[in-house]
Each structure stands twice: as structure tokens, then as C-alpha cells.
């Protein structure tokens, strides 16, 4: 009798498990990506900073902060590529710089993205915000284009193709490039939402954006609050459905044009950039409040980070006069190879798994998101998926952090310069900044400087003392690791993969030539 009851119980439980539409173990996931937000712009990361960010600080107090987090690139497009694919951006056909608003799609439809991974594992997936990974515009004629198209050739009455919906997103709503790059239109599920009715530009110090066609429903200073409004609508709708959701929310701010709305102008007492950061903080607070109000906070993971360091458009001189430094204690800023260009604020709140107020000092990279999600879902990635993505899940508790597998991290600048970091040491394979700060590439700034740069970030976080030549064994080891990372097409364990051809020139790409 007992045996019969046992089998009936097991059968009943199996029936419930096999027929349950929603797996409550799978967390909802919201990934908020700020644009050009400096490490030192958030109070919890820079206590001497002068911008008040109470809501992001609150998010941090409810979760975990990562003090040694890095974007895979120091500029926009490449970092986004790395987040969505778990692959270093320089393995793609874009070896340096960024795309513009009319560029073709960068991510192949054949490549797994975090959205397609989650969609295939029962998630409802959404993208709302700044895309900046290219999509294919419909043209007025049959002209073929490989890289980017002239604005006057675009047919704004037809749908785009090879956009977010083809890369795993069930729902998509956003604009193509940065908010200073035309065309200025919203695209919802491949369809342009408004008619072009004007050509506009702005030449203001902070409000600057390029001249271009603009849709009737597109107002620059309303874009950021509009995206948050759409995000609220998505979350409210999807949380009622019988499946977990993933929302990728890449903001167009505080990147140029720097346009705080009424109520926030002058709020910081510093300048428009600081006002804009405070406005973003407010929106993040409203998003966090919504999750609490819907009673889904316990098993909702919220990630907040930035795509790279702060841009000089923030007006560093004026901010410094008021004792605020967007890069905090670090050297450099957006576009370069120094820490201020790629060390970013990084927060994860997930009450079900993360103890509030936690801190991790381990080095992580924005490419690690795919590996983390695969680990959470207990999904084994295929050999060509997430090739540079190491699960951060072990870092969510002190007991398991010994299982974190990332041994080194590679950094990349706007002009294609590289650096590699392992432990305390960072080895930069150029004698300049690789970007916009001193010493500038292609200038006389680097004359007389050593070929490479080596810094001990533990003793010299500001990268002020070049140790190149003083530690030959460390340098040799780091060069070997870098060479293997290039030639193996991956940094995770697995079969050798191929890096993509250079684009649009298709010339041979060989960063190892710097060692000859």
C-alpha cells in the first residue's frame, strides 16, 4: 500500500512539473546599460564624488557592487557586441571605432545572443533603447551597401531588417545609433513609428547632435524618459504572463546630446552633465520601485552598468573646478586604454541569491553576462557560444567565489589598441593612450616614451609609473596569454574558433605584429 501511494505521489509531482508553464526558479532579468557614465559618477563607487545618486546607491545597497568591473571596449558599439554575444568585440569584423546610425548589422543571425539563449529557454525577451549594433535599412533603390548608407537613400516608409527581432528579441523598440547620430526615428518591431517631417541639428556645447532627418514623434530631450516609460509598460505586461522575462534597456544617456529635462536642469549645482546623471538616477529609482510594487523583486535580477567611461563632453575642466572627477581615482576617460576608459560601475541586485550590501573585488568583464545566465539556467553553451564569457555566479556568495574561472581580461580602445590584465598587473601594448587622452595616438605625445606600458594597479591605480622592462617574466607571461587569446579565437575552454575578417577592407588583421 505504501509503495503504491509513493508511486502515485511521484507520478502526480511529475505531472505537475512537466505541465507547469512557468519555472519559478528562473529569474526575471533587467539589464540597464548607461551610456558614457563614469566610474566616479556614482556615489557608492566614489564617495568623494559631487553628484548625488541616491537611487542607484539604494540599488547597490540591496545587491552587490563590483569594484573591478570592465567594459570589453572603451566605446559604444563594441561593448554592446560583447554584452549580447559573450565574445570580445575585436573578434567581430569591427576591429576599431564604432558604427553610425546607418551602418549595416554587425551581429550575424547565426550567432547566439543572450536574447536568443534566453528565448530558447522559455523567456519573453525585449529590447528598449539605443541599439548601435547596426541594422539594415530599406533603400529607395536596389543599391547594395557593405558598410553604411547615405541618409538620402533610406526609404523610411519600409521596415528595417536584420535588427533586434532577428537576434532573439520578441519585442524591440529603439533607435539605431547614438542620440547624436541620424536618422532620428524610433523603430518598433522593425517598423518605423513616425513619418519624417523635418531636418534638424543642434550646435550647443552640451546639447550637440548631428544634422539629420527626424520623425514627427522623436523629441531628443524626451528620449530617455520615453524609453523608461516603455520599459515600465513592458515589465507590467510581461510579469502577468506565465513565463519569465528579459529586458535589455541600453540608455542613450548621459551620452551627447546632454539634455536634462525640466525639473532636473540646475539640480546638481555642477553642470548639465551632472544634472543628466541625476535624472537617470531618478529613472532607475522608479524602475526599482516598480519591481517592488509588482511584488516580483525577490526573483528579479537587475543589472546596472555603463558601456565605457565618461566622455570629455561632460566638461571635465568645469567639473574638476567643483571637485568632481568622473573617472574617480583612475586615469583617462572614454575611448582610451587607461582604467578610466573601461572600468565601469557595475551593480547586480537579485534578492533570491545575493546578500544586500555585498561587494566583490574580483575582475569581471561585460562579456561575462552570457556565461552567467547559462550557469543560472544550467545550460551548457555550444562550442562557439560565449567564447569569452565566464560565469559570475560563483561571485554571488563568498563561499563559492573560489570557483570563478576568469584568469585574465583583455581591454580594447577606440583605435584598436590592446591591453591585458592579470591580477595586479596591466600590460598595455602601445606607448600612448589609444584614444583621446594624453599621450594621444598619431601625435608627438609619445615621442621618447617606452614602446609598451606596464602598471601595478594595486600599488599604482592611477597608472602613473610605467614599469615596462622591470618584470620580464610577468611581461612574457602576459604576452603569451594574449597571443593564445588571439590565435585560439576564445579565452574560455573549448575548441579553437575563428576571428572574423577585418571590415570593410577585409585586409588581414593581425594584432600580433606589434611584437615583431
How does the language model describe each region?
Residues 2-5, 18-453, 461-494, 499, ...:
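Formylglycine-dependent sulfatase
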Residues 4-13:
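Sec-dependent N-terminal signal peptides
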Residues 458:
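Phosphate-moiety recognition in structured ligand-binding domains
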Amino acid at each position: 500500500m505504501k509503495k503504491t501511494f509513493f508511486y502515485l505521489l511521484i507520478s502526480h509531482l511529475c505531472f505537475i512539473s512537466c505541465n507547469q508553464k512557468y519555472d519559478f526558479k528562473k529569474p526575471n532579468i533587467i539589464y540597464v546599460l548607461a551610456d558614457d557614465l563614469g566610474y566616479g559618477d556614482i556615489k557608492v563607487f566614489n564617495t568623494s564624488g559631487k553628484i548625488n545618486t541616491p537611487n542607484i546607491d539604494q540599488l547597490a545597497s540591496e545587491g552587490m557592487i563590483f569594484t573591478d568591473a570592465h567594459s570589453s571596449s572603451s566605446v559604444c558599439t563594441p561593448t554592446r557586441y560583447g554584452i549580447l554575444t559573450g565574445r570580445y568585440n575585436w573578434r567581430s569584423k569591427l576591429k576599431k571605432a564604432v558604427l553610425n546610425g546607418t551602418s549595416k548589422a554587425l551581429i550575424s543571425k547565426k550567432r547566439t545572443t543572450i536574447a536568443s539563449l534566453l528565448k530558447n529557454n522559455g523567456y519573453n525577451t525585449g529590447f528598449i533603447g539605443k541599439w548601435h549594433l547596426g541594422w539594415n535599412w530599406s533603400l529607395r533603390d536596389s543599391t547594395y551597401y557593405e558598410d553604411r548608407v547615405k541618409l538620402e537613400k533610406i526609404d523610411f516608409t519600409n521596415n528595417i531588417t536584420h535588427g533586434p527581432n532577428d537576434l532573439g528579441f520578441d519585442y524591440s523598440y529603439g533607435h539605431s545609433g547614438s542620440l547624436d547620430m541620424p536618422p532620428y526615428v524610433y523603430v518598433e518591431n522593425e517598423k518605423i513609428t513616425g513619418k519624417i517631417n523635418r531636418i534638424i541639428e543642434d550646435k550647443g556645447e552640451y546639447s550637440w547632435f548631428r544634422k539629420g532627418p527626424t520623425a514627427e514623434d522623436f523629441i531628443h530631450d524626451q528620449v530617455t524618459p520615453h524609453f523608461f516609460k516603455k520599459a515600465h509598460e513592458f515589465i507590467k505586461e510581461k510579469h502577468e504572463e506565465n513565463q519569465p522575462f528579459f529586458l535589455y534597456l541600453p540608455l542613450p544617456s548621459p551620452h551627447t546630446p546632454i539634455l536634462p529635462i525640466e525639473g532636473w536642469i540646475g539640480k546638481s549645482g555642477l553642470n548639465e552633465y551632472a544634472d543628466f546623471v541625476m535624472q537617470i538616477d531618478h529613472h532607475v529609482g522608479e524602475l526599482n520601485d516598480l519591481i517592488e510594487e509588482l511584488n516580483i523583486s525577490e526573483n528579479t535580477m537587475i543589472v546596472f552598468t555603463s558601456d565605457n567611461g565618461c566622455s570629455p563632453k561632460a566638461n571635465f575642466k568645469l567639473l574638476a573646478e567643483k571637485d568632481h572627477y568622473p573617472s574617480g581615482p583612475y586615469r583617462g576617460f572614454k575611448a582610451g586604454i587607461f582604467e578610466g576608459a573601461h572600468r565601469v560601475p557595475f551593480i547586480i541586485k537579485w534578492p533570491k541569491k545575493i546578500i544586500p550590501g555585498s561587494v566583490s573585488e574580483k575582475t569581471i568583464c561585460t562579456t561575462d553576462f552570457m556565461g552567467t545566465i547559462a550557469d543560472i539556467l544550467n545550460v551548457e553553451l555550444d562550442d562557439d557560444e560565449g567564447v569569452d564569457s565566464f560565469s559570475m555566479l560563483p561571485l554571488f556568495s563568498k563561499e563559492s567565489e573560489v570557483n570563478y574561472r576568469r584568469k585574465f581580461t583583455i581591454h580594447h580602445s577606440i583605435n584598436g589598441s590592446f591591453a591585458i590584465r592579470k591580477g595586479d598587473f596591466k600590460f598595455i601594448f602601445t606607448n600612448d593612450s589609444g584614444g583621446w587622452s594624453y599621450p594621444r595616438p598619431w601625435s608627438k605625445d609619445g615621442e621618447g616614451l617606452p614602446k609598451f606600458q606596464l602598471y601595478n594597479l594595486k600599488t599604482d591605480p592611477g597608472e602613473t609609473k610605467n614599469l615596462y622592462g622591470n618584470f620580464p617574466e610577468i611581461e612574457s607571461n602576459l604576452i603569451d596569454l594574449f597571443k593564445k587569446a588571439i590565435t585560439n579565437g576564445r579565452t574560455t575552454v573549448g575548441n579553437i574558433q575563428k576571428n572574423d575578417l577585418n571590415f570593410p577592407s577585409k585586409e588581414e588583421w593581425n594584432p600580433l605584429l606589434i611584437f615583431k
